[in-house]
Amino acid sequence: MTAQIISGTEMARTIRTALADEAAQLKADGVEPGLAVILVGDDPASHSYVKGKQKACAEVGIRSFLYTFPAAIDEETLLAKIRELNVDPAVHGILVQLPLPDHICEWSVIETIAPEKDVDGFHPINVGKMMIGQRAFLPCTPHGILVMVQSAGIDIAGKHVVVVGRSNIVGKPVGQLFLREHATVTYTHSKTPDLAAITRQADILIVAVGKARLIGPEHIKPGAVVIDVGVNRLENGKLCGDVDFDAVKEVAGYITPVPGGVGPMTITMLLHNTIEAARQLAAK
């Protein structure tokens, strides 16, 4: 058995076509969705990610504003810029590219962003609302994963979802989103003994730890859905996920590739949140 590939690239293309229509309708109503992106320092990966986000914004008709700062910027100057953007009527979403330099507190930055412009879904108010099932901006990668699984026609209710990883950005929130869809959720992490004994119970396995090819076929229940969030660069320059794709696809029922899996959906959910923020702010 060879797993069916869940292509985030194809799924994202379909969703972005619909988002472009929504953005065009907002423009026709006098509202041009705007996303402000703040980039601190000269990390090549961060610059690459931001470039991809700006390109995606242009594709669907979202105006993007890029603000770059040197790595030595002091925290208060950065927070002052965010406060300025919070009240800028042309800006509907604010994204601060992470990670930030060590001398800047990420939580101070995240908490300074107005919750109604927090299109990354990281603000404690949005996280809290997500936890209790209220309407909120959902974090982009977990939301993208949920949409991928649903769009593939996979029933979630009653399934055992195992999450490998417990980060605030992916691991913790993705489990909550699947719990809301009536899955039974188990979290695993670096301190979990006998990881394979637990992952082999998973109907849906979500891996987000940043360790190349951590998960092999011995971790997989035959026919399981395997979602690989990891992006790792090998010594030969090639990208790979946290899952040994070639080996695992012979056991799994569905699997996401790296690249071309979760990544395109993460950016697509950012676009979705920005357009939704523009719609909500325009209605006020």
Swiss-Prot record:
Enzyme Commission no: 1.5.1.5, 3.5.4.9
Annotated Pfam families: THF_DHG_CYH (PF00763), THF_DHG_CYH_C (PF02882)
GO biological process, one term: L-histidine biosynthetic process
Gene3D superfamilies in the record: Leucine Dehydrogenase, chain A, domain 1 (3.40.50.10860), NAD(P)-binding Rossmann-like Domain (3.40.50.720)
Assigned GO CC terms: cytosol
A single GO molecular function term of this UniProt record: methenyltetrahydrofolate cyclohydrolase activity
Pathway connected to this protein: One-carbon metabolism; tetrahydrofolate interconversion
Keywords, sorted A to Z: Amino-acid biosynthesis, Histidine biosynthesis, Hydrolase, Methionine biosynthesis, Multifunctional enzyme, NADP, One-carbon metabolism, Oxidoreductase, Purine biosynthesis
SUPFAM superfamilies cross-referenced by the UniProt entry: Aminoacid dehydrogenase-like, N-terminal domain (SSF53223), NAD(P)-binding Rossmann-fold domains (SSF51735)
PROSITE patterns: THF_DHG_CYH_2
Binding site for NADP(+): G165, R166, S167, S190, V231
Catalysed transformations (reactions): (6R)-5,10-methylene-5,6,7,8-tetrahydrofolate + NADP(+) = (6R)-5,10-methenyltetrahydrofolate + NADPH; (6R)-5,10-methenyltetrahydrofolate + H2O = (6R)-10-formyltetrahydrofolate + H(+)
PANTHER family: C-1-TETRAHYDROFOLATE SYNTHASE, CYTOPLASMIC (PTHR48099:SF5), C-1-TETRAHYDROFOLATE SYNTHASE, CYTOPLASMIC-RELATED (PTHR48099)
Family under the similarity heading: Belongs to the tetrahydrofolate dehydrogenase/cyclohydrolase family.
Subunit structure: Homodimer.
Primary role: Catalyzes the oxidation of 5,10-methylenetetrahydrofolate to 5,10-methenyltetrahydrofolate and then the hydrolysis of 5,10-methenyltetrahydrofolate to 10-formyltetrahydrofolate.
Protein name: Bifunctional protein FolD
Taxonomic source organism: Geobacillus kaustophilus (strain HTA426)
Gene: folD
